[in-house]
Amino acid sequence: MLRRYTYNEIIKKSHKRCSNYGIKIDIPCPSKILRDEEFNVIIQKNKALIEIARPFMEILYNFLKGSGFSLYFTEKNGVVLTIIGDQDIIRDQIQMGIIEGADMSEKSAGTNGIGTAFAENISLQISGEEHFIKVFQIWTCSSSVVHDEDGNIIGCLNLTGRRQLAHPHTLGLVVAAVKSIENHLKVKKTQNELVKTYQYLNKITDSVNLGIFAVDTKGIIKAINKSACDMLHINEEDVINKNVDTVLDSWKHILQRLRNGQSYEDEEIMYSDKKKRFNINVYPIKDKNSNITGMVGIFKDIQNVYNLVNKYINRTAKYTFDDIIGQSEAMKRLKEQIKSISNSPSTVLIQGESGTGKELIAQSIHNNSNRRSKSFVAINCGAIPKSLIESELFGYEEGAFTGAKRGGCPGKFELANEGTLFLDEIGEMPLDMQVNLLRVLQEGCITRIGGNKCVDVDVRIIAATNKNLKKEIEDGNFREDLYYRLSVIPIYVPPLRERNGDIGILIEHFLKIKADKLGKLIPEIRKNIYENLLSYGWPGNVRELENCIENIVNMNGNTSFNFENRTIKKDVNCYSDVSLEYDMCSLEELEKRAISICINQCGGNISKACRILGINRSTLYIKIKKYNIKVR
């Protein structure tokens, strides 16, 4: 409020307040001066305000230096925070207790420029006898209250000199200085809000698993988030205000696309000087006239995209060690072996007849390894035409051949990066492709068809075959060097005829699974059918047994499976010569009879019976006791 208040009504109101406060007119100084510890607390609370006000006080004092004035700045309750002025004036004021820490409110110092300006919430000038306390009547005080953006009183600026120096212009100087302080406070608040907003945005962009950067129209990087720096293995200070093409060598192409009004979304790019690919989207920043003023790029590691794709198209391993059914010594040794090598990065070659469960073993290895959270990608080398297997394994770039997809396509190696690649029927791979596969295994990187850049891949290779690869090498169908590269860890999966003791367990397992699948009750199997199940040679191994059990469940315990017209390989573990009477029985009864038959066949030799049944001696004795089986 720009008025010079010297009217008696203002002074009278103030004097009346002072009388009511009980202030004596003859006191030598303000009645309240803060102790050091109290004052230090006040200073800390108003530190930011002092830092803003002090420069304006110094500017104003430079105009008045040597003219007999001093400047005071107080906090919202009238406590003096800082003083600037001519030394002789300050010296006299110190004698009167007008010092830093003095309370200049009306309750402490009577009617004065600071206290009365606070009381009336106005700018005013008080001179001479207008002061309530006599000792202060030698001064003229021009004061203006400082408000924050919301109109709250936060301080006061006061200019004091000898009473004979009173002039209305001095109040104008103070008011102008206060306006400058208030404007600066607004600017500071806006700056703080901008900084806070920037910090919020930084926190948001740093918390997402996406690389984000912003560039101007010249391609100069103006901002980049932490995720981008981590993915590119760079420091923010090394790239800020640098050209983006030092990081992304395809930037000129991106910029041209955007300037031509084309979009640049879900594209695949290569990181400069690195064998790494990213999926990127770039969006233009436009002004109100639709002119491009900059661009924002958002990218992610292409491997994360591949992992997500693999997850949703079920390129994951579902089998674990719990799915490997069997208690025979051969299966126990197999389980121990694959558990011990699961975390090794070395290549694995699984060999075994068709239907023995080679992929089950491969998936179990993956799910027991430190790669279990990554992709398990399988490819059947014998099911893909020779002309396509290279692109399936290594991928291709856009335009590599007629019909190639726009943007190219990753191969199985890239899709399996950081995970496991299962090469089933490796023995069927063409010789020329074996050379390419060997090179990838040796160098750890792939080059897409039509491309010229090598992309690093970290893939655990598990290969499988039902062929005798050593014979294939002799016949010239398989490379010897590839064989040794693949068979760092050889695994042999025994056929079912070598683990007859597991047949009963597998029958029970598949009965439960197939009954659940078909929505049926577990059927009772006729004894003669069960005898055939135990004695049959199972050339198709576990897969053939599984299909046979599904047939039995469908037919409620009977079967259309013709054992006689199939090739049956008999050995010591076959029980086809044993005659069982034709009636119905439970699984427990079947187990009892199977154990009894086995013991009789072995002439009462418990050790031999244990080997055939695939169980240990203590387990067999428990079952002998349970079923009250007589041993000869």
Curated annotation (Swiss-Prot):
The molecular function terms of the Gene Ontology recorded here are:
ATP binding; ATP hydrolysis activity; sequence-specific DNA binding
Annotated residues for binding of ATP: 352-359, 416-425
Record SMART domains: AAA, PAS
Annotated Sigma-54 factor interaction domain ranges read 324-554
Q: Does the keyword Transcription regulation apply?
A: yes
Q: What GO biological process terms does the UniProt entry carry, in alphabetical order?
A: phosphorelay signal transduction system; regulation of DNA-templated transcription
Lineage, top-rank taxon, reads: Bacteria
Record keywords: DNA-binding included?
Answer: yes
- Keywords in UniProt for this one? ATP-binding, DNA-binding, Nucleotide-binding, Transcription, Transcription regulation, Two-component regulatory system
Question: Which parts of the sequence belong to the PAS domain?
Answer: 197-270
List the CDD domains hit by this protein, alphabetically: AAA, PAS
DNA-binding region per Swiss-Prot/TrEMBL record? 606-625
Name the InterPro entries for this protein: AAA+_ATPase (IPR003593), GAF (IPR003018), GAF-like_dom_sf (IPR029016), Homeodomain-like_sf (IPR009057), HTH_Fis (IPR002197), P-loop_NTPase (IPR027417), PAS (IPR000014), PAS-like_dom_sf (IPR035965)
Q: What is this protein called?
A: Signal-transduction and transcriptional-control protein
Q: Which Gene3D superfamilies match?
A: 1.10.8.60, 3.30.450.40, Homeodomain-like, P-loop containing nucleotide triphosphate hydrolases, PAS domain
Q: Which Pfam families match?
A: GAF, HTH_8, PAS_9, Sigma54_activat
